Design a protein with these regions (language model features):
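Active-site helix of classical SDR
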Residues: 120, 157, 165
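Residue(s) in the substrate-gating loop at a strand-loop-helix junction
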Residues: 140
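Alpha-helical segment proximal to the catalytic Tyr-Lys
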Residues: 125, 170-174, 234
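C-terminal helical subdomain
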Residues: 181, 201-232, 236, 243-245
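Short C-terminal tail/terminal secondary-structure segment
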Residues: 94, 237-260
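Conserved glycine-rich cofactor-binding loop
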Residues: 9, 16-17
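Substrate-binding pocket helix/loop in short-chain dehydrogenase/reductase
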Residues: 94-97, 101-106, 206
């Protein structure tokens, strides 16, 4: 049976862990060839070899390195069909606006928002030449909702991703290029586990708002990315694609006693 990404070439930033790694595996399972971009030089080559793809160490805040990444994909595989701009950080220094310093603010904006701008800017010429392509930018459910457990720069950066994605999705729609934001809910990734290990109360405060009663697994988010990257989503663009277990539409979540 032919995979939904058969013959496509996907570039995945932040591809060595969490959602990025799960997506790289899903893409290959669906027939794509992948280029994995990350700063993790210890694991990147091994992961790429495991998946039959290639790895390029890439600082996504560096324009020259981002341009080299997409040039590498084009030169190696002949096209760039899907760009999953997924690299991101959520450092402990990013907290309430009253506690977050300007340096922490700038660092998060550079990695989470400026990198998406750089990746879109670098890949669009290849997709325009091809007359087709799918760009998926990782945002977050926190850009849709407010949260008292604040990460002010993270939230603002993801809001910027949503706005930029909508504009690009509309601007390039007639050129055969689709641009969508992926908005995951809380996901069971190393990044989230590290964050919540330091603050179990914060984890509990978030989990109680998820109607499904659990965090997503990376593979569940990867399924959504594969859908958005495939021709099955051919009439979907400029959207905020929520994969959040119902969190963003929940006011009161269900109790087991509700079903007695």
């Amino acid at each position: 049976m032919t995979g939904k990404l058969e013959g496509k070439v996907g570039v995945i930033t932040g591809g060595c862990s969490g959602i990025g790694l799960a997506t790289a595996r899903k893409f290959v399972a669906e027939g794509a060839r992948v280029v994995i971009a990350d700063v993790d030089e210890a694991n990147g080559p091994r992961i790429a070899a495991e998946l039959g793809g290639s790895f390029l160490r890439t600082d996504v805040t560096n324009q020259a390195e981002v341009e080299a990444l997409f040039a590498h994909a084009k030169a190696t595989y002949g096209s760039v069909d899907v760009a999953f701009n997924n690299a991101g950080i959520s450092p402990p220094g990013d907290d309430s606006i009253l506690k977050t310093g300007i340096d922490a603010w700038k660092t998060v904006q550079q990695v989470n928002l400026t990198s998406v701008y750089l990746c879109c800017k670098a890949v669009l010429p290849y997709m325009l030449e091809q007359g087709k392509g799918s760009i998926i930018n990782t945002a977050s459910f926190v850009a849709i909702m407010g949260a008292a457990t604040s990460q002010i720069s993270y939230t603002a950066s993801k809001g910027g991703v949503l706005a930029m994605t909508r504009e690009l999705g509309v601007q390039f729609a007639k050129k055969g290029i689709r641009v969508n934001s992926l908005c995951p809910g809380p996901v069971n990734t190393p990044l989230l586990r590290e964050l919540f290990a330091k603050d179990p109360e914060r984890a509990a405060r978030r989990l109680i708002h998820v109607p499904m009663g659990r965090f997503a697994e990376p593979e569940e988010i990867a399924n959504a990315v594969a859908f958005l990257g495939s021709d099955e989503s051919s009439f979907i663009t400029a959207t905020d694609f929520l994969v959040d277990g119902g969190l963003s539409n929940a006011y009161v979540t269900p109790l087991e006693s509700d079903f007695d």
